């Protein structure tokens, strides 16, 4: 029996864009790694046998992007997922890092 495990898409492992593309910044210091584009992340995940990729809206499209930028980014990401056979089993909204949400936004009494 081998001690190594070689995952395949059948194992259904998924990874978040925010984990793979994390630049290494924290409250104690600035980023320490270069940015990785979402399409590069998709290619890398496919290479290691991942099933899919998860994301928050702003992991893919930065806050403040124009409609044209958004459409290009989404089209490129969708094409990369199709080209590499990755699913997107979870996409959600970031309701925690933008300052507008500092008081809970939707539940804030202010």
Identify what each model region corresponds to.
Residues 1-110:
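N-terminal pre-domain/capping segments
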């Amino acid at each position: 029996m081998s001690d190594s495990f070689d995952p395949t898409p059948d194992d259904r492992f998924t990874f978040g864009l925010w984990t793979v593309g994390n630049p290494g910044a924290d409250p104690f210091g600035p980023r320490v790694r270069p940015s990785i584009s979402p399409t590069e992340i998709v290619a890398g995940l496919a290479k290691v046998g991942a099933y899919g990729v998860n994301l928050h809206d702003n992991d893919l499209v930065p806050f403040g992007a124009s409609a044209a930028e958004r459409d290009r980014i989404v089209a490129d990401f969708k094409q990369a997922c199709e080209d590499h056979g990755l699913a997107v089993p979870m996409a959600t909204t970031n309701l925690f890092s933008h300052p507008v949400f500092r008081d809970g936004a939707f539940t804030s009494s202010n």
